[in-house]
Curated annotation (Swiss-Prot):
MF (Gene Ontology): 2-oxopent-4-enoate hydratase activity
Temperature dependence: Stable up to 35 degrees Celsius.
GO cellular component entries: cytoplasm
Catalytic activity, as annotated: (S)-4-hydroxy-2-oxopentanoate = (2Z)-2-hydroxypenta-2,4-dienoate + H2O
Organism: Pseudomonas sp
Family: Belongs to the hydratase/decarboxylase family.
Known EC number: 4.2.1.80
Activity regulation info: Strongly inhibited by Fe(2+), Fe(3+), K(3)[Fe(CN)(6)], Ag(+), and Cu(2+).
Record Pfam families: FAA_hydrolase
Stored SUPFAM superfamilies: FAH
Top-rank EC class of the record's enzyme: lyase
Effect of pH on activity: Optimum pH is 7.5. Stable in the range of pH 5.0-8.0.
Biological classification of the source: Bacteria, Pseudomonadati, Pseudomonadota, Gammaproteobacteria, Pseudomonadales
Protein name: 2-oxopent-4-enoate hydratase
Keywords: Aromatic hydrocarbons catabolism, Lyase, Magnesium, Manganese
Length: 261
């Protein structure tokens, strides 16, 4: 199986480098989600060997509707690297994206390691420095987004780029469950949501991640960014698009795409 994992990981990596999406890989993953994560990890190690630095994790499949659609009962996660970080309002070269779609999220920044067993919600809150509004630019190495849970897990949870807002906000006094979200493109509303759409509360998603990573031996560390999951529908991006997301209590963030090169 390790040889097959290496082959599939290489195909996904080549798809990213060549900017040419490939056919779904799920038909070659007989070991289920565990095997898909093993494939993901091969490419994580490839990125580290290339000099990339881990900056955090992203959580996907936090919507009950999407979970039902894909036939799963849990979220998934991927790894964020420094090469994926984009400043608020910075122009994103279209060549950095692959079938990009945008979704608005609550980002959490961790200030203390969460490396012990039986992490509680209070542990998570105490370890969180602040929250920020975020736009995640997801991308798929699988052609036409023809994915199921195995495809997206193997493909680093369809991670692409991420944009964080500039103004950190402490959790105290925030009601992230009821925080409304509006995302606009060129001034037109394209996505509407609320914190409760993310596993009932963005902190629920982050707690799931923290516990899962401890079990896998790769816990959240001080300084990590956690993209907690979409608050509303994701929207396909086109060259030249400018997205702005506003999240109640957190402010706004913009993702600005260059014209096609």
């Amino acid at each position: 199986m390790s040889e097959q994992n290496a082959k599939l990981a290489a195909l996904l990596n080549e798809a990213e480098l060549s900017e040419k999406p490939i056919e779904p890989v799920r038909g070659h993953i007989e070991g289920g989600i565990a095997q898909a994560y093993a494939i993901q990890q091969i490419n994580v190690q490839r990125q580290l060997a290339a000099g990339r630095r881990v900056t955090g994790r992203k959580i996907g499949l936090t919507s009950a509707a999407v979970q039902k659609q894909l036939g799963v009962d849990q979220p998934d996660f991927g790894t964020l690297f420094d090469s994926m970080a984009v400043n608020d309002g910075e122009e994103i070269a279209w060549s950095r994206t692959l079938q990009p779609k945008c979704e608005a999220e609550v980002a959490l920044v961790i200030e203390r390691d969460l490396d012990h067993e039986n992490i509680t919600l209070i542990d998570l809150i105490g370890a969180t420095a602040y929250a920020l509004p975020a736009i995640e630019v997801v991308g798929s190495r699988i052609a036409n987004w023809d994915i199921n849970i195995l495809d997206t897990v193997a493909d680093n949870a369809s991670a692409g780029l991420y944009v964080l807002g500039h103004t950190p906000v402490k959790l105290e006094g925030l009601d992230l469950r009821l925080a409304g979200m509006v995302m606009e493109r060129a001034g037109q509303q394209v996505s509407l949501g609320v914190g409760a759409a993310c596993l009932g509360h963005p902190l629920n998603a982050a707690l799931w991640l923290a516990r899962t990573l401890v079990k896998q031996g790769t816990p959240l560390k001080s300084g990590d960014v956690v993209l907690s999951g979409a608050l509303g529908p994701l929207v396909a991006a086109n060259p030249g698009d400018v997205f702005e997301a506003r999240i109640q209590g957190l402010g706004s963030v913009r993702a600005c795409f260059s014209p096609a090169s």
